A protein has these predicted regions:
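Active-site mouth of glycoside hydrolases
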Residues: 49-51, 55-269
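N-terminal secretory signal peptides that target proteins for export/translocation
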Residues: 1-20
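Extracellular glycoside hydrolase catalytic/binding regions
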Residues: 192, 199, 205-358
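N-terminal pre-domain segments of enzymes
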Residues: 43-53, 488-489
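Aromatic- and carboxylate-lined catalytic core of secreted/periplasmic carbohydrate-active enzymes
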Residues: 69, 286, 295-297, 310-454, ...
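Signal peptide processing junction and immediate N-terminal pro/mature segment
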Residues: 34-44
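Bacterial N-terminal signal peptides
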Residues: 22-35
Length: 493
């Protein structure tokens, strides 16, 4: 495009020229004194650069961007955001999650809480006549805004086309509205609509796959999504509690990575130990926990017996999953997923309104796991519980129940990390790190602070005692090959 030249008025004779110059100067000074116009939220969202496309890494263990940069999935369950929040509320929530270092928010188009018949904040329901082939433009215009605003803030949307009660009404409001034909049409419509946005498709919605017909519905919806977006976005499946997508659809070509719902118990055994089972499956696919125990949730759905979870419970789930091979992690808060406030019927006893819950300690501590792992080689990380020396009483170390120790390292053995969920002494095989000398540090998962311990030879096992004892005082031991010169844990590369 040719450059534009400023239009300069010709000088006028006498007083007219003087007046004109004064007017022009005054206008210039006024323009310089005014603040630059601020784009509206909608304009900012529309003008934002697209988020990088994501793909599965070459070793099939992680997600990377189109430039092969590692992508750390730090998700949050915002299941009802499209259905319950207006734009002001959504803006408050999204700003908070972006500030806290989250990278994904998980949200449902056809929502759980009577999502077909109870309208959104602007009075719109998602479908005409409960027909997936007749989406309501007014409803999805609001979905558009939230998706694009999230993207503008650097957040991908883990987009569930529907909650599971619309294809398997094992429980919930339903009704069941999907068959293979309309599921494919609905998927294609969504794919076309969001093909250029930063979304990750999540099928399922907290229900098991129990029949061939249900399996066919999911496959048809995935086929429609891929046809609509041209295969631009990854696809996974959110399973029912205590299960993983791998149990039903691991071999399906449309499934790019596995998702587990380890759920709302606080024990390692029987839930969190199952991530390693999915990690070991072939063909190899990345895996993460898309719904672990929520903060402030009734533990095992039985608050009278076990009480409500606290930040320590959600931290344990984070490191149990990551160190067992997950490529990322999803956090959740019991008030936030349902966006509960005093105007709504509470589901399973939330403790405080969502506007306060978004700043609970667990939410603020999740990003420490991200910064820790991003400060070391990322795409070569593997589970490595064999770093830990079993105690004479193995239920102490590596432990059991809420107090299970787990470890990870990279394949080149330049570093190793051990998560200690309780402040008790434990021993490690120093030879797990390849260097002759090993630099040891403590990383505090509650604050993100790192403290040097010292440098030690790698030719013998060594016992380490966490800086503080106590069952809610968890620690991470970081062992580095001293020759690599890595920065302190959590301080970047």
């Amino acid at each position: 495009m040719p450059s534009r030249r400023a239009i300069v008025p010709r000088p006028l004779p006498g007083i007219e020229a003087w007046v004109t110059r004064r007017i022009l100067l005054a206008g210039l000074l006024l323009a310089l004194s005014l603040p630059a116009p601020q784009a509206t939220t909608a304009q900012s969202a529309a003008a934002a650069r697209p988020l990088p496309r994501l793909r599965v890494s070459d070793n099939h263990r992680f997600l990377v961007t189109e430039k092969d940069d590692p992508f750390f999935w730090l998700g949050d369950t915002a299941w009802e955001i499209f259905h319950r929040l207006d734009r002001e509320g959504a803006e408050r929530y999204l700003q908070n999650r972006a500030k806290l270092g989250f990278t994904v928010v998980q949200a449902v188009a056809l929502a759980e809480f009577d999502g077909l018949h109870t309208p959104n904040a602007y009075g719109a329901t998602p479908l005409h006549s409960d027909d997936p082939t007749q989406p309501n433009e007014a409803y999805f215009t609001h979905v558009d805004w939230i998706v694009r605003r999230a993207n503008a803030l650097g957040l991908y949307v883990g987009f569930l086309p529907t909650w599971g009660d619309k294809w398997n009404i094992k429980r919930g409001a339903g009704p069941e509205i999907f068959n293979a034909n309309n599921a494919e049409q609905y998927g294609a419509w969504l794919g076309r609509r969001y093909k250029d946005d930063g979304v990750i498709w999540i099928l399922g919605g907290d229900r098991p796959v129990e029949t061939d017909a249900q399996r066919g519905i999911l496959a048809a919806m995935a086929r429609g999504l891929k046809a609509g977006d041209g295969g631009a976005h990854l696809i996974t499946l959110h399973p029912s509690g205590g299960q993983g997508s791998a149990s039903w659809v691991h071999d399906e070509p449309w499934l790019d990575f596995n998702m587990r719902q380890n759920g709302h118990g606080a024990e390692f055994t029987g839930r969190y130990d199952q991530l390693a089972v999915d990690y070991a499956r072939t063909p190899i696919k990345p895996v993460l926990d898309g719904e672990p125990i929520y903060e402030d949730h009734p533990i095992a759905f039985d608050a009278a017996k076990f009480g409500h979870s606290v930040a320590a419970d959600v931290r344990r789930a984070l490191y149990w999953d990551l160190f067992s091979g997950a490529f990322g992690h999803t956090y959740g808060h019991h008030s936030v997923w349902q966006f509960w406030d005093a105007t709504r019927t509470p589901v399973n006893n939330p403790l405080l309104p969502w506007t306060g819950a978004i700043d609970q300690p667990g939410a603020q501590q999740m990003h420490h796991g991200r910064t820790l792992l991003e400060s070391r080689p990322f795409l070569t990380r593997v589970p490595a519980d064999d770093v830990i020396v079993a105690d004479r009483v193995p239920t102490s170390v590596p432990g059991a129940g809420r107090y299970r120790f787990v470890a990870t390292r990279d394949t080149d053995r330049t570093y190793a990390m051990v998560y200690a969920p309780v402040g008790r002494p434990f021993a490690v095989h120093m030879a797990a790190v390849a260097g002759r000398e090993v630099r040891a540090s403590w990383f505090n998962p509650r604050t993100g602070a790192a403290t040097a311990i010292g440098t030690f030879p790698s030719d013998a096992d060594r016992t380490f005692t966490p800086p503080e004892a106590g069952e809610l005082l968890d620690w991470i031991l970081v062992l580095d090959d001293a020759a690599k010169g890595y920065r302190m844990p959590g301080q970047g590369r």
